[in-house]
Amino acid sequence: MGKLVALTVLGASLALLGERLLNFRERVSTSREIKPTEPQNCHLIEGLENGSEDIDILPSGLAFISTGLKYPGMPSFAPDKPGRIFLMDLNEPYPKAQALEISDGFDQDSLNPHGISTFIDKDNTVYLYAVNHPHMDSTVEIFKFEEQPRSLVHLKTIKHELFESVNDIVVLGPEQFYATRDHYFTSHFLVLLEMILDPHWTSVLFYSPKEVKVVAQGFSSANGITVSLDQKYVYVADVTAKNIHIMKKHNNWDLTPVKVIQLGTLVDNLTVDPATGDILAGCHPNPMKLLIYNPEDPPGSEVLRIQDPLSDNPRVSTLYSNNGSVLQGSTVASVYHKKMLIGTIFHKALYCEL
């Protein structure tokens, strides 16, 4: 009887694993054909060669870019170089990327920046918040931006026991922000198992000096996060579920679900067009090529625009798509006055005029 029970349990476990493997294969399918779509006047940005995972543009047109991310399972073209924060002034006729110096006292060799977000205080001081993975840990670094000379002053490192596998961040007040956890586990083996079994254990966190709490959960892999222009709604990308969750923000910072927009492609970082309120999504049309990188058959890039996301019928259109011949592994797109920057996990960055 004991052997029969053991065999039954083993058989059920293998059947479940087989079903989950098929589901995983479907979620990271490489079967999609990419129809090239490119605005006029696009060119690669000189100096950004090792990723540009996230981009945040100030109302003034200054764009902050996080580069050099080393992420488990992803390629890296400069594994021994620390990450950097770059700046571009999109008001210039020919914007160039400038690496920002960081004040003494911060271990720049440990900088491994992921998602970033800016906050402008009442006195117009600009603060940059960056998810950092020093030694594959997760922290949030707070910097003050200095206009003259353009540089960053490190103010604070935020750590918390809930800050595991943090991906992206959106800041809504002084030391008040939402952050996403893209995995529940942190060890490579358990992360792989989590990706296959897909238990939907990832979440959105809220942080303030007074409290840290989980405000939304049940995502396959919570990734990019941003807010509507009126800051009443929070947009969360569930990357492996291929959708965007729209959530209502309450006075106590809790989030409640409103709707889900299905996109049929893996959704990474999100930004909002300041002129229209449209969502821009950096996407991965063939993610298996990210996991198994072949420079002869690289992963493609895709940027989607979601118009009227709060309406009953949001309109989804493609702003940019490429099979990897120009841009590989797009993660983010951000716009300012008809100028668009597209970033990637480990590859280059693109400047386009819309």
UniProtKB/Swiss-Prot annotation:
Disulfide bonds join C42-C352. It is found in: Secreted, Extracellular space. The modification Phosphoserine is found at S165. The keyword Metal-binding applies. Keywords: Calcium, Disulfide bond, Glycoprotein, Hydrolase, Metal-binding, Phosphoprotein, Secreted, Signal. Ca(2+) 2 binds at D54, I116, D168. Binds 2 calcium ions per subunit. GO terms for molecular function: acyl-L-homoserine-lactone lactonohydrolase activity; aryldialkylphosphatase activity; arylesterase activity; dihydrocoumarin hydrolase activity; metal ion binding; protein homodimerization activity. Pfam families: Arylesterase (PF01731). The active site is at H114 (proton acceptor). Homodimer. Belongs to the paraoxonase family. This is Serum paraoxonase/lactonase 3.
